Amino acid sequence: MSTPIRILGIDPGLRHTGWGVIEQSGARLVHIAHGVIDPPTDLSMAERLGHIFEAVGELARHHAPHAAGVEETLVNANPRSALKLGQARGAAMAALAMAGVSVAEFAPRQIKLSVVGTGTADKDQVKFMVQRLLPRAGEMKLDAADALACAICAAHHLPLQMKRGAA
């Protein structure tokens, strides 16, 4: 039996940053934990980013992942929203880097394809499949489901060296 590899998935957002932790042992995936980071909306932008940074850093310290998968920013019709989302993503990635966690980035389409089988799946389809792939996960918010999907995608795509934190 192989040594379990712990993977943290992050679905970044300024209002809701989803997170999920899984362990991979061979082809088997096991749910460890999931949740959503909700920075208070009355904080300034810098304070919200700091909140995300601190919370993701604490998750990395508590769960000690070997690797992390972070969803890439989808550039949409609103460049201002994409920029703000990118800042939240940067705060999460910086926290992971500070904790010494290897980070891989995945496009939303790649995550959906990896979990659902189609890159055009909607959030409810992703959540449905995450709950099927990780039956012990129980009920979850969509942001947490997206983060777990990112962790599952990372489990499928990361090279073994990165999963183990090797240089």
Curated annotation (Swiss-Prot):
Provenance organism: Hyphomonas neptunium (strain ATCC 15444)
As for family, the record states: Belongs to the RuvC family.
- The yes or no answer to whether the keyword Metal-binding is present is yes
Gene designation per UniProt: ruvC
Which positions are catalytic residues?
A: 11, 71, 143
Cofactor(s) demanded: Mg(2+)
Q: Where in the cell is it found?
A: Cytoplasm
Q: Name one GO biological process term.
A: DNA repair
Q: Quote one Gene Ontology molecular function term.
A: crossover junction DNA endonuclease activity
Q: What does this protein do?
A: The RuvA-RuvB-RuvC complex processes Holliday junction (HJ) DNA during genetic recombination and DNA repair. Endonuclease that resolves HJ intermediates. Cleaves cruciform DNA by making single-stranded nicks across the HJ at symmetrical positions within the homologous arms, yielding a 5'-phosphate and a 3'-hydroxyl group; requires a central core of homology in the junction. The consensus cleavage sequence is 5'-(A/T)TT(C/G)-3'. Cleavage occurs on the 3'-side of the TT dinucleotide at the point of strand exchange.
Q: What is its main location?
A: cytoplasm
- Which EC number(s) does the record attach to this protein? 3.1.21.10
Give the protein's recorded name. Crossover junction endodeoxyribonuclease RuvC
InterPro entries noted in UniProt: RNaseH-like_sf, RNaseH_sf, X-over_junc_endoDNase_Mg_BS, X-over_junc_endoDNase_RuvC
